[in-house]
Structure formats: C-alpha cells, structure tokens
Amino acid sequence: MALPAGYSRNWSGPWPKTPGRVLGTAFVRLYQLTLSGFIGNSCRHFPTCSEYAYEAIARHGLWAGGWMGLFRVMHCGPGGTHGIDPVPEILQPRHAWWAPWRLWKLKP
C-alpha cells in the first residue's frame, strides 16, 4: 500500500516557526530517523510518543511541549497508560510556564 504524496507521520498543521520550536521538532525528527529504528515500535499510545512530542512542541513551544513530551514518555511503559491520547489544542491558564509539573496529568 503506497502512502499519498506529501505524507508525514508527524503533525502537519500550521505552527509558528520560532527557533525553539524548530530546534525541538528537529531533535524529535532526528530521533525518529535514527534511534527509533533500533528501539523498535513499542509505544502503547496513539499517536506514538515521538509523534506526540513533535506535535506538542510545534503547537505549544519548546518549554511546554518538551515537558509534555517528557511526561508522555514517562507514562509509556509497563504499568503505564495506553490508548488514544491526543495533544490538547489549547493549554488552559492553570498550565503556566513556571509550573511544568501541572502538565503531568494533562487531559485533552
């Protein structure tokens, strides 16, 4: 089965191309192209943890999106969560930049 032209496994919606977001998404993409192949497809979520981190950084910036991606990876594993877990489109005001621990139990 062939994939459509221009297909990307990562989120392709509009996002501001700030230096932090570009750098963060570049690191995630580098991981996807290199280490992900050696580790194998073992993510228990949809979208996968790296796709989630890419979208979170693209939508919410390097600081909030990076924390969201880190917490998602920490949830993924034996005894962790599983299933469909999309990135929220908008972060609520209680998710302030100076309180990243509030992103731990983030629900869309």
From Swiss-Prot:
Keywords: Cell inner membrane, Cell membrane, Membrane. Its main location: membrane. It comes from the Bacteria. InterPro entries: Membr_insert_effic_factor_YidD. GO terms for cellular component: plasma membrane. It is found in: Cell inner membrane. It is a peripheral membrane protein. Belongs to the UPF0161 family. Could be involved in insertion of integral membrane proteins into the membrane. PANTHER family: MEMBRANE PROTEIN INSERTION EFFICIENCY FACTOR-RELATED. This is Putative membrane protein insertion efficiency factor. The lineage of its organism: Bacteria, Pseudomonadati, Pseudomonadota, Alphaproteobacteria, Hyphomicrobiales.
